[in-house]
UniProtKB/Swiss-Prot annotation:
EC code: 3.5.1.10
Name of the protein this chain belongs to: Formyltetrahydrofolate deformylase
Biological process per Gene Ontology, one example term: one-carbon metabolic process
Pathway in which this enzyme or protein is active: Purine metabolism; IMP biosynthesis via de novo pathway; formate from 10-formyl-5,6,7,8-tetrahydrofolate: step 1/1
Active site per UniProt: D228
Family: Belongs to the PurU family.
HAMAP family associated with the record: PurU (MF_01927)
Residues of the ACT domain: 7-90
Keywords: Hydrolase, One-carbon metabolism, Purine biosynthesis
Entry function: Catalyzes the hydrolysis of 10-formyltetrahydrofolate (formyl-FH4) to formate and tetrahydrofolate (FH4).
NCBIfam families: PRK06027.1, PurU
Cysteine pairs bridged by disulfides in the record: none
Gene expressing this chain: purU
C-alpha cells in the first residue's frame, strides 16, 4: 500500500523566502517532503512550485490543513491547489468514431498505469458503445446537430455533474465545444493531430503531405474557447519522408496521438501541471 501524500501546486508573485516558508509550514506540522520542484518566470515575475509530502504523521487534519495553508497563501498572494493521493480523480472520455486513443487510455487505466476512475464515456455516435460495454463503463450517445448543440451540451454538463467528473478527455471527439461549455467546465484535455501551431483545424495530415513536411507531430492541450489554442501540455514528433503517403502519415500520427494523450493525462492525474498566461509549467 502506497504512503498517503498531499501535493501542493502553487503560483504567486516571486519574492525571497517562498521556498523556506512552504518547507517550514510542512515541517512544523510534521510532514516529510518527498518531492519538490519549482520554477521562476522572470519575465512575468511569477514563482511556481510543486511539493509533495507524506501525511503519515502530519498533525493537521485535512480541513485544518486547508484552513492553515489558505492563511499563508493569502500572505503570498498565491493561487493554489492541494490534492490527496487517496482521492482518485474521476475521468470522462469523449469520443466520436475513432477508437485508437480510447482503447489506449482504457488499457492503461485497466493495467493500473493511470490512477483514476473512469465511470463515463460520452459520444456523438453509437459506434464505440461495444468498447464501453467491454470495460463495464456507462456509455451515453448524444448526437450533435447545429440545431440541438446547445441542448446537448446542457445534457452533457448534467452528466458530468451526475457522475462527479473532475476531468474530461477528448479522445478524438470531433466536435467543437462552445465557449459557454468550456467556461462552465474548464478541466478538458484535447489531443490534436498535428504539432501545434502548425496545421490547426481539420485534415492536418493531408495538408502536411501537400506541404512535403519532414516531421509530423501530435499535441495534447487544455481546451479553451479558442480552437486548438489552449495551454500545451505535451507534444511529440516523428520523421517522415517523401516515400510516405497520406495513409502512412495517418498511421504514424495515430501512434503519436496515443502516446502524447496518455502522457498528458498521466501528468494531469499526478498533479504535475500549472497553467498560467495560456501556457503550462510541467513538473515532470
Amino acid at each position: 500500500m502506497q504512503n498517503l501524500t498531499a501535493t501542493l501546486l502553487v503560483s504567486c508573485p516571486d519574492q525571497p523566502g517562498i521556498v523556506a516558508q512552504i518547507a517550514q509550514f510542512i515541517y512544523q506540522n510534521q510532514g516529510n517532503i518527498i518531492h519538490a520542484d519549482q520554477h521562476t518566470d522572470f519575465s512575468s515575475g511569477l514563482f511556481l512550485n510543486r511539493v509533495e509530502w507524506q501525511l503519515d504523521n502530519f498533525r493537521l487534519s485535512r480541513p485544518e490543513l486547508l484552513s492553515a495553508w489558505s492563511q499563508l497563501a493569502e500572505q503570498l498572494q498565491a493561487t493554489w491547489q492541494i490534492h490527496f493521493s487517496d482521492q482518485l480523480p474521476r475521468l470522462a472520455l469523449w469520443v466520436s468514431k475513432q477508437d485508437h486513443c480510447l482503447l489506449d487510455i482504457l488499457w492503461r487505466w485497466r493495467s493500473g498505469e493511470l490512477r483514476c476512475e473512469i465511470p463515463l464515456i460520452i459520444s456523438n455516435h453509437p459506434d464505440l458503445k461495444s468498447i464501453a460495454d467491454q470495460f463495464g463503463i456507462d456509455f451515453h450517445c448524444l448526437p450533435i446537430t447545429k440545431e440541438n448543440k446547445l441542448a446537448q451540451e446542457t445534457a452533457e454538463l448534467a452528466l458530468l455533474k451526475q457522475y462527479q467528473i473532475d476531468l474530461v478527455v477528448l479522445a478524438k471527439y470531433l466536435q467543437i465545444l462552445t465557449t459557454d461549455f468550456v467556461v462552465q467546465f474548464p478541466n478538458i484535455i484535447n489531443i490534436h493531430h498535428s504539432f501545434l501551431p502548425a496545421f490547426p483545424g481539420a485534415n492536418p495530415y493531408h495538408r502536411a503531405h501537400e506541404r512535403g513536411v519532414k516531421i509530423i507531430g501530435a499535441t495534447a492541450h487544455y481546451a479553451t474557447a479558442q480552437l486548438d489554442e489552449g495551454p500545451i501540455i505535451e507534444q511529440d514528433v516523428v520523421r517522415v519522408s517523401h516515400r510516405d503517403n497520406v495513409d502512412d502519415l495517418i498511421r504514424k500520427g495515430r501512434d503519436l496521438e496515443r502516446v502524447v494523450l496518455a502522457r498528458a493525462v498521466r501528468l494531469h492525474l499526478q498533479h504535475r501541471i500549472l497553467v498560467y498566461d495560456n501556457r503550462t509549467v510541467v513538473f515532470a
